[in-house]
């Protein structure tokens, strides 16, 4: 995202980045929390596109480089709308392939920008990141943790233990019943972590929070 921010700043544009997230907005929330974007829209909350345009134009105006960034979950939808799909073709789980919300947001932001930019249109850079979010060179932790998980999983099998999930608990390797992840969907708690008016993450304190916050 930092490379794309440079492009947006050079041309003083709005930058729309579409990322994974069919039902949950963690892939948009965490980078925004880390400073990769000014705003984010997520599946857990239907956003007002005009409010988003207003906020991004304000962000751009106050930025010395004259650009602003929004991260868009692929499963996000605007007020009164629904999820957008590329086609009716479904995967092996019956899910239709998502696509189009980033394009919609980009077009609407450009059309609405004169209202919040003294009548002048702001052009938009629209980029669907897709698998680029999951790419990158592994660091030491990326190599050590899966090696440990694999060995621990084999240990469980050798002991005849099934239906268990290898986990990190309080910084130490452990295992737990697998239904802790299969019994429900993990979604962003918008009352706790998402400001629905400002369209970005919020938090009260980092004290005693898990490492990844959400």
PLM feature segments, named:
Residues 1-122:
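Accessory alpha-helical/coil subdomains and C-terminal extensions
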Residues 86-214:
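C-terminal non-catalytic interaction/assembly regions of soluble proteins
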